[in-house]
Amino acid sequence: MDHSQCLVTIYALMVFLGLRIDQGGCQHYLHIRPAPSENLPLVDLIEHPDPIYDPKEKDLNETLLRTLMVGHFDPNFMATILPEERLGVEDLGELDLLLRQKPSGAMPAEIKGLEFYEGLQSKKHRLSKKLRRKLQMWLWSQTFCPVLYTWNDLGTRFWPRYVKVGSCYSKRSCSVPEGMVCKAAKSMHLTILRWRCQRRVQQKCAWITIQYPVISECKCSC
């Protein structure tokens, strides 16, 4: 470890201690990443297992279905066949690490505004801009909560069948000091089609548009 890396590690430990405050609960984590004001539960769709409620081949005409979508088809989040780049649950940890190495978006104000000093209390002075930047980037990478997108198969009763959904990786702590985890903070809605049957006898079925929620932002939270 070179001298610069050693200093970053030492000052990071000093930041750990300096950010602690004597409050209950998890309030002492809020200096690095404030918790969102509310949770964002996304409920799984529950479908009747009886195949009698499935659309028939004639109901899956792609030209007609695209017309019913009225311009809402988003190829970045929707697909009619399973994309090759689909990730499994076991890949999310690796993806989380990869995205945190280069955090996207604007650096959080609470990190950008941090000042770092060295020396005794009576003779302390600010760190160089280069070292200060390294510390800020390190803190940002530790507290960054990227949205991890994977393709989800909704089944034949939805069109497009495959939708890209977001999740927040919660198997690591995202706060300094540790204690908080990444949780959903915001969502967006995709307009897709759902096959709905209103009666079992003399079935009356049709495609209807629905709003499908997808996590769009993750934040550090208690």
Curated annotation (Swiss-Prot):
Sites carrying sugar chains: N61
The record ties this protein, via InterPro entries, to: Cystine-knot_cytokine (IPR029034), Noggin (IPR008717)
The record's subcellular locations are:
Secreted
Q: Which domain of life is it from?
A: Eukaryota
Any one of the GO BP annotations: dorsal/ventral pattern formation
- UniProt KW Secreted keyword: yes
Q: Which GO terms describe its cellular component?
A: extracellular space
Disulfide partners: C145-C182, C168-C218, C174-C220, C197-C205
Q: What induces it?
A: By activin.
Coiled-coil annotation reads none
Q: Provide the alphabetized UniProt keywords.
A: Chondrogenesis, Developmental protein, Differentiation, Disulfide bond, Glycoprotein, Secreted, Signal
- Which positions carry the signal peptide feature in this UniProt record? 1-19
Please state which protein family the record places this protein in.
Belongs to the noggin family.
Could you tell me which PANTHER family the record lists for this protein?
BONE MORPHOGENETIC PROTEIN INHIBITOR, NOGGIN, NOGGIN
Q: How does it assemble?
A: Homodimer.
Functionally, this protein is described as follows: Patterns the embryo by interrupting bone morphogenetic proteins (BMP) signaling. Binds BMP-4 and BMP-2 with high affinity. Can abolish BMP-4 activity by blocking binding to cognate cell-surface receptors. Capable of inducing dorsal development in embryos. Causes dorsal mesodermal differentiation of animal cap ectoderm when coexpressed with xWNT-8 and nuclear, sequence-specific DNA-binding protein xBRA. None of these molecules causes dorsal mesoderm formation when expressed alone.
- Would you tell me the protein name for this molecule? Noggin
Q: Name the encoding gene, please.
A: nog
